[in-house]
């Protein structure tokens, strides 16, 4: 494993929360070390247009925004390490973390590990992952040019994926278990325009029963009517994109931090220290602690808060010496 690297402040995650925390911590001369995780840049790297980032309304993409954040963090001399942490010890001081490429210790820790795409859990879905089943249209949509595809989900992500794929695929079948969609109104408006004048076909009150295929990959899906369970229909599609939400990346913290439905619990913030977890000196920011708002801007905001909380914590340690 080699030598252990120690830092005053370690940040886990390279999405908006992690990079923002790094900028604020670096400007406070905390000399932060940021561990990127396996998905450098987080979920925004799979997002095409970002229209709600204040001050940049035109032609901003997720990858571009994350590239700028990376540059901003490095400008203030954040040390960025590409590694994935697979084990932590938060019961002793300093905190100890083991990665694929090294071992790290720190006096304060900011967890900004984000969330990962959730799947339905069907055996047939698992069987065709990477062979026609995907959770990222911007990653894999290119492979389905002029082919029929299906998207399952009813929120912002599902509608965005369907709209994106409608510019690539010949037909996009959007499947949702309820009658109405939960997406933002502007996205619903665009969706309905594509339904009326384009190539998106809605299948509401339907659940995915099975993914069908052969040795080459996905060939179709079977849907069940939620209002008449005897009604099963089949669609011929070459790809299925699952967009049913995300699960927080907190598995390595189970049994060490207080969690709620997998999300890290933090303080209310009425008296400050809003991002502190159940262990003093460990802070959380972004989607790993927020299952409600889940926006790039709110993730960045909590990253800022975590850095300020960590700075105050470290100042307290220094004063106590």
From Swiss-Prot:
Gene Ontology terms describing biological process: cell redox homeostasis; removal of superoxide radicals
Gene3D superfamilies cross-referenced by the UniProt entry: FAD/NAD(P)-binding domain
Disulfide bonds: 136-139
Pfam families, A to Z: Pyr_redox_2 (PF07992)
Cofactor binding annotation: Binds 1 FAD per subunit.
Family: Belongs to the class-II pyridine nucleotide-disulfide oxidoreductase family.
Protein name: Thioredoxin reductase
Species of provenance: Escherichia coli (strain K12)
